[in-house]
Amino acid sequence: MERTQYIKEQVLRHYNYIKDKYDVLYLALQGSQNYGLDVYDKDYKSDVDTKAIILPSFEDIVYNRQPVSKTIVLDNDEHIDVKDIRVMFENFKKQNINFLEILFTDFYVINEEYKEDINYLRNSAEQIARLNINQALRCMAGMSKEKLKALKHPYPATINKIEKYGYDPKQLHHILRMNDFIKKYGIQNKKFKDCLIPDNKDYLIQIKKGLLDEQDATMIAENVDNDTYNVKEKLVTELDLINQTAIDILNEIKYNILKQKFKKELLEEN
């Protein structure tokens, strides 16, 4: 099956899996396909993972129920990260690029009732992705450090790779990807969407498939992570400059969507 069609079908499958369990506002692709780093061959097959924004009920708010924030693992080991709109929008404000990327992906499903607000959200994505540049830079460097710590850690999901290569090649490729990303975002001031696709993606795919031996992989991982940290240190300013317009946009969209949903719920009760 052609790549684009395959991804579309898997994203729709995720939506269909949760649509009867939650009031889904927006479900979007996350991960390697958004970076052009997905692989489908006899040696490696990339999962299709998604994030979903869901809406609470009026009753959830009144009774102060814990907002939903969970990960669903499907039978094929693909993941759906499900988060209440309040939780997801706070993650956007925290500038974690793993969350921000869902505003830029070409693969998504929307709730047509809220189409206007979702389009407004996606059209405002670049502003939201630079809501707090210092925090975004810290997140990128932090992600690189997390991947370095995970490089040789025998997690249940990666222990086979550790035993085979002496390290997890996927973690190394993430470290290299973060270095490419932080330089485009912070030094070259490129648009966020353009930062998602690394310049050396063919090389990163080979890295992910285990190109390097353990010694070279360890050395490169440590050096590149250190470079990413140094870039962050050089770019972060003394004070965080907050893009209040981006915050206002997120708050406005959240308000409009929840107002519309609760109004509909209450009218249906009567």
Region locations from a protein language model:
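Generic structural signal for hydrophobic core residues of well-folded globular domains
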Residues: I54, F92, N179-G186, K261
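A cross-kingdom marker for long, charged
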Residues: A246-N270
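N-terminal regions immediately upstream of nucleotidyltransferase
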Residues: M1-Q10, T228-L235
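A basic- and aromatic-enriched beta-loop-alpha substructure that forms the phosphate/nucleotide-
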Residues: I61-H153
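Membrane-interacting alpha-helical segments
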Residues: Q5-K21, N76-D77
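Conserved nucleotidyltransferase catalytic core and NTase-mimicking acidic/glycine-rich helix/loop elements
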Residues: Y114-E252
